[in-house]
Amino acid sequence: MLPDTGILSPFTTAVNPDPPQSQTLRVPRPTPVLDRPTTDSTANKRVKLDPTVSKVPWEPSVKPSSSKVEGASGLEQDSFMPTLGSVFKKKKKDKEATRLKDSSGNPDTIIEDSPVTPSTERSLSQSLGSAPSTATTANSHGGLSTVTSATSQTPTSPIATGGQAEKDHPMTTPVNESAGHSRSDSQTLQKAENAVRATKGKYTLQDFNFQRTLGTGSFGRVHLVQSKHNLRFYAVKVLKKAQVVKMKQVEHTNDERRMLQRVKHPFLITLWGTFQDAKNLYMVMDFIEGGELFSLLRKSQRFPNPVAKFYAAEVALALDYLHSMNIIYRDLKPENLLLDRHGHLKITDFGFAKEVPDITWTLCGTPDYLAPEVVASKGYNKSVDWWSLGILIFEMLCGYTPFWDGGSPMKIYENILRGRVKYPAYIHPDAMNLLQQLITPDLTKRLGNLYHGSRSVLEHPWFAEVNWERLLSKQIEPPYVPPVRGGIGDASLFDKYPEETEEYGKDGPDQYGHFFTDF
């Protein structure tokens, strides 16, 4: 095994051989997120090459201005992912997201989404034993990809129906870390089936000991905290009310809380509760120790076929679940996929998530991952998430997104509307077939938007060897386990930031409280 990578194939399918040394791979350039500023220093951005560094870490022969990386070394067939250099170090300065501008230079107007109605559809996750769409547990380090990491407890349980808190709840007494872990996530979800999740005003600052800052952004930061009651570690996202209002993020912030309050799934991050004071909003979430899939992908350059399949399968189950609840996610990308300490994925950042039963027109997302109907300002539905899954699979297999060309975001949009994708010869035939049916502008042919819905994706031949029930219950060993110690607040995978808590808990007039009545 290559010691500093440690990625194993979770499936029996052989890894397709890599291209010859003459084959070139492109390194994705940074692209802005539309419409929503990030609350994390690196979230919602494609990686930037530091102009002060003359070489890309994994390919010494390439300068930062180059659009290609020459001489990618081959992947070990069947089992291992190569290490092609040290982990790419992200720039620590804040990188605020930007919005699309029209030809006149003015930001596009956000059109309100349609009224919503409850969904009657059931996801495959639910049919395999997970909670129905009425379950009201939540998840997120929303908007803070570098800030979130796997839960310090497994599994994370919601508050029980009878009002008795489960062992992992922040307000309960200390428990043995190894106790209570024999239950599968499916069993946990079944137990939560009729639970009512109330998050408003559940905690106060006095319930937690603040440990350190995990990430910062344009209108907030995320802290690692320890519950004074059960001594477990959590992530508390703090948003400054004045900044949220100033940057016109009130609707997205409230949507994020609402979506996370409703969802409960093994591959979605959990929101335990919210509270506020005169100056700030607080969201108590799982602490996900393992970091972003983005970092692992950049370190490895690209994944073998079975490794990409494992992560894509977990994402597909999460999307299937969200869609059964009429929730469109709209911001799928490696930066928003976090690895828990066991190596399973957690989707975070629900700032763009929206409950939409039919179509919506809101322009939001990351340029590389936008579907053509979004770029063209047409009404769109849940199928945009399946398009994004195709882009994600392509990036995991190739190391770059299909419509990136090193130019401006507008050039990316032109490429998306043009719709021409060049598939490298080393992509597995089944994977290529799936991608061609996901990354298609024709909605009558896009998988996930057809008669059988998400099942047309899950039953595709590329996923043939996936046991979905075992995957949902986390019985399939992940290909990579992050080098962190669980249960002790190990934040070694996060950069250090100057601490700032002086504005927390101060009394005074609450000028913006009426915007956030549900916190």
UniProtKB/Swiss-Prot annotation:
Biased composition (Polar residues): 10-25, 116-159, 173-191
Chain ranges of the Protein kinase domain: 208-463
Region span, Disordered: 1-195
Enzyme class: transferase
Catalytic function, reaction form: L-seryl-[protein] + ATP = O-phospho-L-seryl-[protein] + ADP + H(+); L-threonyl-[protein] + ATP = O-phospho-L-threonyl-[protein] + ADP + H(+)
Keywords attached to this entry: ATP-binding, Kinase, Nucleotide-binding, Serine/threonine-protein kinase, Transferase
Cited SUPFAM superfamilies: Protein kinase-like (PK-like) (SSF56112)
Protein origin, superkingdom: Eukaryota
Keyword Endoplasmic reticulum: no
Protein EC: 2.7.11.11
CDD domains per the UniProt record, alphabetical: STKc_PKA_like
Biological process (GO), any one: adenylate cyclase-activating glucose-activated G protein-coupled receptor signaling pathway
Name this polypeptide is given: cAMP-dependent protein kinase catalytic subunit
Species of provenance: Arthrobotrys oligospora (strain ATCC 24927 / CBS 115.81 / DSM 1491)
Gene name per UniProt: TPK2
